[in-house]
C-alpha cells in the first residue's frame, strides 16, 4: 500500500533541507515549454502604395485591408505605414499576418496585384528583405550588370527533322540500367541516337508534345532534350513518385508519397510554406514552384465504400485544354479550380457540388453551337444520395454555368469518356437491378457541339461494359463487354467486342449511333485506336490464357455487307497476331506502327518487344533481358491548315508513288551493299588461301617432301597394283548371282 500523509516523517516535511536545484525537471521543461515565435516569418512588406498625408492614411489602410484579408487575417493595428519628415507616407507598409502560411500566401497571390489604375502592389516577405537588404549586401554605388554574350541554344523540336528524310519517329527504351533513344527503322535494327547508363532511377516519360524526356530521381525530376540531350530543367522535389504535364507543356505537377520536409538549412527551390506537402505545381519556363498541396484523405461514400479499397487518384490535378486552369477534386464536397499562372482559387472559393465523385475536362477547347464567348468545359457526376437521383452535369468555366445535366437512377458506377475533339462525351453508366444481383450498362452520349447539347442513349447492351474507347478525331467507338461480374478470378471470363458508328444522315449532320457488329467468345480486354483514327487494335493484355492482337479497319474499301450500307463504317479484320506475356501496347504518333512489349516490372518471362505495322504484319521482334519500358516520342500538333491537309490527302496517291520508289531504292541499295560486302569478304578469303598454299609448297620443298602429297599417294598406290613389265597378269573369274521373283501369293490360315 502506498504511504499516506500520516506515514511521512518530520524530516520529509522539513523545507529548510529541500534544495530546488537538485530536482531535475529538464524533461518536463522540454515537453511543456511554450515556444515563442521568433523572426519575421509572419511579416510582409507591401510596396507600391500611393503617397498620402496623415488624414488620408486611415482611408488607405482600410482600402488596403480589403486586399490583404483576401488571403489571411489582418487587423488595422497589424498594418504599420511609416511617414516621412514632410508629413507624407513613404509609399510602403509593414503588415503582420496571423501565421507564416498566410504571409507566404500573400506574397504568392498579392504580388503584382493592381491597387488602382496607377498603382500596383509589390509584396515580399520580411525575411527576404532582411536577407537580401541587410547592410553589406547592397553596394552603395551602382554597378551596371554584366550582360553575357548571346549563346544560341539547340532547337528543342529538332527531332521533327529526320536526317534520313523518311519521316521516322523516335522512341525510348529502358532495359536493365540503360536508357536509349532510337530512330524507328521498321524491320531493320533501330538506329541509336543516345544511350546512357543510370539515366533514371525509376522510369522515363515524354512530355505531351515530345519536347522533353523526363527522368525521375530521389532528389527530384530532370528534363532533357535538344540534339545533344543536355539537361534543360531541374525540379528538386525529394522522393518524387509521379509526374504529369499540362497539355501545352507550360506546367508540371509532381507527387511524392512522403510529405516534403524542409531542413533547417533551407531548400534550393522550396520554402517553409511547402513543408508537409505532397504535390508541387511547377512553371516549366522558370523551373520555379507555383504552389504546393498536401495529400487528401478520400472520404467514404456509399454503403460499400468501406468494403472497397480506395484507389489512389492520378492525376489528382487535371488541366484544362488551354493550360489556363487546373482543378482538383475534393471528393464528396466540391471541385477546386485554380487560375494559372498565379494559382489563385477561382472566385476565391471551391465549386460546391454535393457528393461529387469524379470530373474530366474537355480535351479540346469546345465550340458549342450558338456560344461565341470563351469557355472551357468539364463533366462531373454525383451518386444517388437518399431519395435524390444520381446526376451528370456539364459545367462551363469561368462562368460556372451548368450547360446540361442529366438525372440517372439505379446507378452503381459511372465513367466519363471524352472524344478527342470534345464533340462528344460518353457517360458509361453501370446500373444494378432492384435485387442488386445483376448489372448492365447504358451509354449516355452528350452531343456537345449541337445546340442544347442533346443526349442520345444506347441501351441495347445487355452485359457489363469493361472497356470503352472513342475513335480519335472521329465518331465511332468500340466497347468490350462481359456477362460475368468483373473481379479477381483465376481464369478471365470470355468477352465480346462490339463496334458502333453513326448512321448516314443528310448534309453534315451526324446520325444516331447504331450497332455495327459484335465478335463473341473473345479474351480481349483492351482497345487501342490509331491516333489518326480508322485502325484499331483489340488485345488481351496481361492475360495468362491469351495474348491475342486483332487488327481492324473500320473504313475497309471493299464491298459492304447489305445490312450495313446505311452506316458510316465498313469493318474488316486485317490480321491476328500473338505476343506471349504482353503487358503494354502503344501506337506511334503517325499511326503507322504499333509496339507491344513484355515488361520485367510485371513479370520476368520472355521480356522484350514486337513491332507491327498498322495492318498487323510483324516487322521485328527482339527478346531483351530485364526489358522495362518502351515509349514513342509524341509529336506536336501540325502547323498545316485544314485546307493544306485536305490538298495533301487529295494528292496522296501521287506522294505514295514517290515514297514507294524511295523505299524500293533504299531496299535495293541495301541489297547491293550486302552483295558487295560478301564479294569483298570472299575475295579476301581466296587471296589468303592462295598465299597459304604458296607458303606450304615452299615449306615442303625445303623438307624434301613432294609438292602435292595427294598425287604422290595415288602414284604409289597405282604402282602397287600394276604388274611389272614382262609379268603375266593372273586371270580372275567373277561370278554374279541374280534372283528373280516370278509369282507371289498370300494365304491366311485360321
Curated annotation (Swiss-Prot):
Annotated RRM domain residues: 42-128
Record-linked PROSITE patterns: RRM
Subcellular location: Cytoplasm
Domain of life of the organism encoding this protein: Eukaryota
Keywords: Cytoplasm, Initiation factor, Protein biosynthesis, Repeat, RNA-binding, WD repeat
Gene Ontology BP, a term: formation of cytoplasmic translation initiation complex
Residue ranges of WD repeats: 195-234, 236-292, 309-348, 519-562
Broad class of where this protein is predominantly found: cytoplasm
Residue ranges the record marks as coiled coil: none
Keyword Repeat included in the entry's annotation: yes
Molecular function GO labels: identical protein binding; RNA binding; translation initiation factor activity; translation initiation factor binding
Oligomer and partners: Component of the eukaryotic translation initiation factor 3 (eIF-3) complex.
Summary of the function given for this chain in its UniProt record: RNA-binding component of the eukaryotic translation initiation factor 3 (eIF-3) complex, which is involved in protein synthesis of a specialized repertoire of mRNAs and, together with other initiation factors, stimulates binding of mRNA and methionyl-tRNAi to the 40S ribosome. The eIF-3 complex specifically targets and initiates translation of a subset of mRNAs involved in cell proliferation.
Protein name stated in the entry: Eukaryotic translation initiation factor 3 subunit B
Organism, scientific name: Chaetomium globosum (strain ATCC 6205 / CBS 148.51 / DSM 1962 / NBRC 6347 / NRRL 1970) (Soil fungus)
Lineage, highest ranks first: Eukaryota, Fungi, Dikarya, Ascomycota, Pezizomycotina
Amino acid at each position: 500500500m502506498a504511504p499516506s500523509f500520516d506515514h511521512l516523517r518530520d524530516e520529509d516535511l522539513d523545507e529548510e533541507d529541500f534544495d530546488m536545484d537538485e530536482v531535475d525537471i529538464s524533461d518536463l521543461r522540454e515537453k511543456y515549454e511554450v515556444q515563442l515565435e521568433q523572426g519575421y516569418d509572419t511579416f510582409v512588406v507591401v510596396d507600391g502604395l500611393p503617397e498620402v498625408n496623415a488624414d488620408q492614411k486611415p482611408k488607405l489602410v482600410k482600402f488596403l485591408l480589403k486586399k490583404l484579408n483576401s488571403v489571411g487575417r489582418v487587423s488595422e493595428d497589424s498594418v504599420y505605414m511609416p511617414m516621412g519628415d514632410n508629413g507624407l507616407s513613404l509609399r510602403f507598409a509593414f503588415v503582420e499576418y496571423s501565421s507564416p502560411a498566410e504571409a507566404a500566401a500573400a506574397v504568392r497571390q498579392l504580388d503584382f496585384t493592381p491597387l488602382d489604375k496607377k498603382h500596383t502592389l509589390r509584396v515580399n516577405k520580411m525575411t527576404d528583405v532582411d536577407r537580401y537588404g541587410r547592410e553589406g549586401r547592397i553596394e552603395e554605388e551602382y554597378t551596371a550588370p554584366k550582360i553575357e554574350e548571346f549563346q544560341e541554344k539547340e532547337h528543342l523540336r529538332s527531332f521533327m527533322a529526320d536526317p534520313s528524310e523518311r519521316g521516322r519517329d523516335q522512341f525510348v527504351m529502358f532495359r536493365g540500367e540503360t536508357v536509349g533513344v532510337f530512330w524507328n527503322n521498321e524491320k531493320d535494327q533501330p538506329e541509336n541516337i543516345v544511350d546512357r547508363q543510370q539515366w533514371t532511377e525509376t522510369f522515363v516519360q515524354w512530355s505531351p508534345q515530345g519536347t522533353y524526356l523526363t527522368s525521375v530521381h530521389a532528389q527530384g525530376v530532370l528534363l532533357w532534350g535538344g540534339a545533344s540531350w543536355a539537361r534543360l530543367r531541374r525540379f528538386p522535389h525529394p522522393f518524387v513518385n509521379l509526374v504529369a504535364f499540362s497539355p501545352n507543356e507550360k506546367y508540371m505537377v509532381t507527387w511524392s508519397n512522403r510529405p516534403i520536409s524542409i531542413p533547417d538549412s533551407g531548400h534550393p527551390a522550396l520554402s517553409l510554406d511547402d513543408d508537409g506537402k505532397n504535390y508541387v505545381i511547377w512553371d516549366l519556363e522558370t523551373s520555379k514552384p507555383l504552389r504546393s498541396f498536401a495529400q487528401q484523405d478520400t472520404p467514404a461514400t456509399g454503403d460499400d465504400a468501406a468494403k472497397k479499397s480506395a484507389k489512389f487518384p492520378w492525376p489528382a490535378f487535371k488541366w484544362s485544354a488551354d493550360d489556363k486552369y487546373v482543378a482538383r477534386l475534393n471528393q464528396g464536397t466540391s471541385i477546386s479550380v485554380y487560375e494559372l499562372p498565379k494559382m489563385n482559387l477561382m472566385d476565391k472559393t471551391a465549386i460546391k457540388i454535393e457528393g461529387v465523385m469524379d470530373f474530366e475536362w474537355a480535351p479540346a477547347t469546345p465550340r458549342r453551337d450558338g456560344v461565341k464567348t470563351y469557355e472551357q468545359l468539364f463533366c462531373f457526376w454525383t451518386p444517388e444520395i437518399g431519395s435524390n437521383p444520381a446526376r451528370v452535369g456539364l459545367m462551363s468555366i469561368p462562368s460556372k454555368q451548368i450547360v446540361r445535366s442529366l438525372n440517372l437512377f439505379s446507378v452503381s458506377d459511372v465513367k466519363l469518356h471524352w472524344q478527342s475533339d470534345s464533340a462528344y462525351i460518353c457517360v458509361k453508366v453501370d446500373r444494378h437491378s432492384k435485387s442488386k444481383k445483376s448489372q448492365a450498362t447504358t451509354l449516355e452520349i452528350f452531343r456537345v457541339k449541337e445546340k442544347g447539347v442533346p443526349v442520345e442513349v444506347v441501351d441495347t447492351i445487355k452485359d457489363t461494359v469493361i472497356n470503352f474507347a472513342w475513335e480519335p478525331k472521329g465518331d465511332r467507338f468500340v466497347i468490350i463487354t462481359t456477362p460475368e461480374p468483373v473481379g479477381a478470378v483465376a481464369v478471365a471470363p470470355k468477352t465480346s467486342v462490339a463496334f458502333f458508328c453513326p448512321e448516314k444522315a443528310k448534309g453534315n449532320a451526324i446520325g444516331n449511333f447504331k450497332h455495327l457488329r459484335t465478335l463473341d467468345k473473345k479474351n480481349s480486354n483492351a482497345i487501342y485506336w490509331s491516333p489518326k483514327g480508322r485502325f484499331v487494335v483489340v488485345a488481351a493484355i496481361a492475360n495468362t490464357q491469351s495474348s491475342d492482337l486483332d487488327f481492324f479497319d473500320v473504313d475497309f474499301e471493299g464491298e459492304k455487307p447489305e445490312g450495313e450500307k446505311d452506316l458510316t463504317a465498313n469493318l474488316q479484320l486485317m490480321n491476328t497476331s500473338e505476343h506471349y506475356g504482353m503487358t503494354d501496347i502503344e501506337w506511334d504518333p503517325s499511326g503507322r506502327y504499333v509496339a507491344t512489349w513484355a515488361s520485367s516490372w510485371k513479370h520476368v518471362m520472355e521480356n522484350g518487344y514486337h513491332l507491327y505495322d498498322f495492318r498487323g504484319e510483324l516487322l521485328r521482334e527482339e527478346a531483351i533481358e530485364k526489358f522495362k519500358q518502351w515509349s514513342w516520342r509524341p509529336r506536336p500538333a501540325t502547323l498545316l491548315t485544314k485546307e493544306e491537309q485536305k490538298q495533301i490527302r487529295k494528292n496522296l496517291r501521287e506522294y505514295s508513288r514517290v515514297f514507294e520508289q524511295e523505299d524500293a531504292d533504299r531496299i535495293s541499295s541495301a541489297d547491293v551493299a550486302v552483295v558487295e560486302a560478301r564479294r569483298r569478304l570472299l575475295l579476301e578469303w581466296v587471296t589468303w588461301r592462295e598465299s597459304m598454299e604458296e607458303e606450304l609448297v615452299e615449306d615442303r620443298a625445303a623438307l624434301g617432301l613432294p609438292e602435292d602429297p595427294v598425287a604422290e599417294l595415288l602414284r604409289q598406290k597405282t604402282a602397287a597394283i600394276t604388274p611389272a613389265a614382262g609379268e603375266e597378269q593372273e586371270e580372275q573369274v567373277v561370278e554374279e548371282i541374280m534372283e528373280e521373283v516370278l509369282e507371289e501369293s498370300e494365304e491366311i490360315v485360321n
